[in-house]
Amino acid sequence: MAPKQDPKPKFQEGERVLCFHGPLLYEAKCVKVAIKDKQVKYFIHYSGWNKKSAVRPRRSEKSLKTHEDIVALFPVPEGAPSVHHPLLTSSWDEWVPESRVLKYVDTNLQKQRELQKANQEQYAEGKMRGAAPGKKTSGLQQKNVEVKTKKNKQKTPGNGDGGSTSETPQPPRKKRARVDPTVENEETFMNRVEVKVKIPEELKPWLVDDWDLITRQKQLFYLPAKKNVDSILEDYANYKKSRGNTDNKEYAVNEVVAGIKEYFNVMLGTQLLYKFERPQYAEILADHPDAPMSQVYGAPHLLRLFVRIGAMLAYTPLDEKSLALLLNYLHDFLKYLAKNSATLFSASDYEVAPPEYHRKAV
């Protein structure tokens, strides 16, 4: 019997593609193609991503047990000393399976736009629902750390978190003659582990006030912030060091703080801004093209990150124990924000946008 032939790659080296990274699609380039164990993989470079502007969740089949394992999920900040650990790399490029790669065609570009829009709407709706008393919400009223598999949920399709459960098995799907690779990617996405971080009760009102000040009252957070993200993170790191942590834990805190900063700088422009803020963001980019946004923005935008960061961590295929351990670090930082909320959050940090700005924001 003749040996089974290797599968034929759908994409070629140098080809422009779209690649799933987290819940979104990004423009990318196929740098290399490899076939191993009858599976096609591609070495992907994300267009426009570099050490200053990009971060990706680390992928490993290992279970994280030590502090060094945990911080390996975050990228090494530029200029930091090299850490010899198998989960850390210096490149933002990565090997991905064929199921995450799509052709760069109009239909998939439309899907990219739809996913981006849905992601932004889900973010806004999650913040709005957080203000409603007596109702379950998708993100703000979960347990401290919640890690669960979406495919194991028994909720009726289409229901939100407040929906009823159903014990009735779903009828089997009709078999398709051909499998759409786009649909395959979406199903894979829906089956991934869902990671949610609880926002402390003391901080929830600030999420709502922040939304109200910007979207309803048409005010803008004053930039540059009186106390920027870099300064907040530095204060937190110093606070943890002052409590007599061991060298290993101190190292972990430093790396987690650096990771939060990198995630913030990457996600701000695409996932952490309201529509009304975009002209302001464009002006900041024009005036300070080389400045990291963590040196410009402050506590309210940093808090928004923790509503969204779970979606990125969900694409790190680690077991529940490892994810919970990582999230403990993030939640500890949130407790620090809550403890210092009186000095970090204030409505006086916002200002009414001038008439000419309103014309830009239309």
From Swiss-Prot:
The keyword Nucleus is assigned to this record: yes
Gene Ontology cellular-component annotations: NuA4 histone acetyltransferase complex; nuclear speck; nucleoplasm; nucleosome; Sin3-type complex
Broad class of where this protein is predominantly found: nucleus
Region annotation (Sufficient for interaction with SIN3A) ranges: 133-266
Region (Interaction with KAT8): 26-62
Region annotation (Disordered) ranges: 113-182
UniProtKB keywords: Acetylation, Chromatin regulator, DNA damage, DNA recombination, DNA repair, Growth regulation, Nucleus, Transcription, Transcription regulation
Region annotation (Interaction with RB1-1) ranges: 164-230
Region Sufficient for interaction with PHF12, annotated ranges: 188-342
Domain MRG: 191-362
Subcellular localization(s) per the UniProt record: Nucleus
GO molecular function (one): chromatin binding
Location of the region described as Interaction with RB1-2 in the Swiss-Prot/TrEMBL record: 323-344
All copies of domain Tudor-knot, residue ranges: 12-51
Residues carrying N6-acetyllysine: 143
Pfam families attached to this UniProt entry: MRG, Tudor-knot
Ranges spanned by the short sequence motif Nuclear localization signal, renumbered to the chain: 135-146
Assembly and interaction partners: Component of the NuA4 histone acetyltransferase complex which contains the catalytic subunit KAT5/TIP60 and the subunits EP400, TRRAP/PAF400, BRD8/SMAP, EPC1, DMAP1/DNMAP1, RUVBL1/TIP49, RUVBL2, ING3, actin, ACTL6A/BAF53A, MORF4L1/MRG15, MORF4L2/MRGX, MRGBP, YEATS4/GAS41, VPS72/YL1 and MEAF6. The NuA4 complex interacts with MYC and the adenovirus E1A protein. MORF4L1 may also participate in the formation of NuA4 related complexes which lack the KAT5/TIP60 catalytic subunit, but which include the SWI/SNF related protein SRCAP.
Function: Component of the NuA4 histone acetyltransferase (HAT) complex which is involved in transcriptional activation of select genes principally by acetylation of nucleosomal histones H4 and H2A. This modification may both alter nucleosome - DNA interactions and promote interaction of the modified histones with other proteins which positively regulate transcription.
Record-given protein name: Mortality factor 4-like protein 1
Gene field: MORF4L1
